[in-house]
Every structure is written in C-alpha cells, then in structure tokens.
Amino acid sequence: MTLAVKVPLKEGEIVRRRLIELGALDNTYKIKREGNFLLIPVKFPVKGFEVVEAELEQVSRRPNSYREIVNVPQELRRFLPTSFDIIGNIAIIEIPEELKGYAKEIGRAIVEVHKNVKAVYMKGSKIEGEYRTRELIHIAGENITETIHRENGIRLKLDVAKVYFSPRLATERMRVFKMAQEGEVVFDMFAGVGPFSILLAKKAELVFACDINPWAIKYLEENIKLNKVNNVVPILGDSREIEVKADRIIMNLPKYAHEFLEHAISCINDGGVIHYYGFGPEGDPYGWHLERIRELANKFGVKVEVLGKRVIRNYAPRQYNIAIDFRVSF
Ligand SMILES: C[S@@+](CC[C@H](N)C(=O)[O-])C[C@H]1O[C@@H](n2cnc3c(N)ncnc32)[C@H](O)[C@@H]1O
C-alpha cells in the first residue's frame, strides 16, 4: 500500500504537475485509473488534496537517465542538461540559470539513477586561472572531492576541486598514444595529474611531466605509483623554464598554448612531433594558430609539416577546442 492523491480524471494532469512542483510525486509507483478518478502516488500527504491508501503497481524498469525521475516543473524540463561528466564516482553538471533552484533535486536524481555516483557538484564558475580549475558547488551525495578515475586502462587519482581533469579528452589521449612510437622521449608540458604522461609511459622511454599546480604534481606522483610506471619524471614549475629535448611534446593548455610555442620548438628534436591544442572560432578554428606556428617556424629556421588537425569538442557557443599535430624538421 502507498499514499495516493485521488483526483477526478480531467484534473489529473494539472494535479500531477502541481505535485511535481511540491516535490511530492512518487515516481516509483505508477498512476492508476479507478472509474472516473486517478490515483497519483505521493511521497507524503499533501494539504488541499484527498489522500488515500492505494494498491499501486511499482515502476519496475530502472530509469536510464536522471531526467526520467527528477522532480522539476513540467515547463522547465526542457532546460534539463542532457549530459554531465562523471569523474570516478563524482558527477559534475552544468545547471542552467532557469534550473538553479532545483539543483538539489537534480543532484539527488543523478545519485539515484547512477549507482556508482557518490557525490554530485554543480559548476559554479568557468574554468579559470593558471591551474585551470573551477568553483564547484556540492548539490547531492557525499561531500567528497577526491576520487579515482579509470580511462584507457590506467587509474588516475585526483581531487576535482584542486586540479584540472576532463574525462571528455579520453579519446584524444588514446589518439596521441596510438601516434606515439616505442622508445621516444616525451615532454608533457601541462601534465595535470598525468592522463597523457602515464598512458604514454607505456611506449616511451622517458616522459617529462611538468605542471605548475602543486596539487597536480602531488596526484601525478601518486598516479605513477598507482600505475606502476617507472619512467615518468614529475616536474613542478613553469614548463617554459624546463630545458629538455624530446621527440614528442604535448601542449594541452588550449587557452595559452600559443604563448609556449617558442619554448616547445626549442625543446623538440629533429623530426619530433608537437601536439598543440587551442581554442578557435567557428568557420576557421585553426587559421590563427597555424599562422603562429608558421611564424615561429620561420623565426627558428625550421620546417613544419602539419600531420593532422581536428575539432575535439565545442568549448563555448561558436568556439571549438582544436588540436593540431605537426612535425618539426631542422
Ligand atoms: C588544461 S589542463 C591539462 C591537464 C592534463 N594534460 C589533462 O589532460 O588533464 C592544463 C594544465 O596546465 C597547467 N599549467 C598552467 N600553466 C602552466 C605552466 N606555465 N607550466 C606548467 N603547467 C602549467 C595547469 O595547472 C593545468 O594542470
């Protein structure tokens, strides 16, 4: 037996919406028709409605999406985000202004549907600052920010509040791994907690992994142990000040990578490959970056061969996160 609001058939939809607004609708039971009435399952007695005890059928199918069970007013449902990131057992979601008042409902629904998710955070700012982190606002589940994320066969321990990490780049990291050759020396200029470095360590002879964020380096050191790799050298500092020679350089700092190009070219070995990342506008997202690369190639008197370029993902409206791979020959 469960509690249900009994309403005339023709008022059913209006009452259902009202119950959603009140957070009273119990989605775990099905609505039942009884003659000219509907029995709408509720979580608690609701003032102003006739509440009865009823035998209702339980909803047996496990929902596929939090959107199927979340209690938000019908007219706002169209604003519900269709995707969010899951990093280890932590979900991070961008909630539009219209739904900010329902953030906790959304968080609760995510925890309910995704059994592996233990904590949910709402994005509280854009990615900003030198460390490329953002403010996170806790909306559901446990108040934890440290987790272990699995991707491409490696484990990455990290704190989502203290370091940059995006699970959306997993395919890009695998693509770079596939391009890498056995026995190379790699310079990961903006290593973070090591998703490129640790993966590439499986092929490379040596990986220099630099980051300016002490938390990133702390987790990188833990991840080196966690993944039992012995050829990654963590370096805390500004990668412009690190003088190494490498066959492959990864420049995963899209917002500022162009400022580091000169140093990258000075670190690359003859015939080496640079994986450059940037942001660019719709239409020609590569043009500005390719010009910078060619300018510097002229300045250094080296040859540049573009091996590939692609859009990785949308970054903002009409702005793309792009990648350019190029070979440098002396
Ligand atoms: C976009 S994140 C990429 C992290 C990592 N490659 C990944 O895929 O998760 C850029 C990283 O560059 C680091 N960073 C920013 N400026 C730097 C600098 N001058 N030298 C070294 N690292 C820097 C930030 O702390 C941040 O961890």
UniProtKB/Swiss-Prot annotation:
CDD domains, A to Z = AdoMet_MTases
Q: What class of enzyme is it?
A: transferase
Gene Ontology BP terms: tRNA methylation; tRNA N1-guanine methylation
Q: Any idea where this protein resides?
A: Cytoplasm
Q: Name one GO cellular component term.
A: cytoplasm
Q: Which domain of life is it from?
A: Archaea
Chief site of localization: cytoplasm
List UniProt keywords, sorted A-Z: Cytoplasm, Methyltransferase, S-adenosyl-L-methionine, Transferase, tRNA processing
Q: Which cysteines are joined by disulfide bonds?
A: none
Pfam families given for it? TRM5-TYW2_MTfase, Trm5_N, TYW2_N_2
Annotated residues that bind S-adenosyl-L-methionine are located at 173, 211-212, 238-239, 252
Q: What is its EC number?
A: 2.1.1.228
Q: Does the keyword Transferase apply?
A: yes
Is Methyltransferase tagged as a keyword? yes
The entry's function note states: Specifically methylates the N1 position of guanosine-37 in various tRNAs.
State the family named in the UniProt similarity comment for this chain. Belongs to the class I-like SAM-binding methyltransferase superfamily. TRM5/TYW2 family.
Put simply, this protein is called: tRNA (guanine(37)-N(1))-methyltransferase Trm5b
Q: Which species?
A: Pyrococcus abyssi (strain GE5 / Orsay)
Q: What is the lineage of its organism?
A: Archaea, Methanobacteriati, Methanobacteriota, Thermococci, Thermococcales
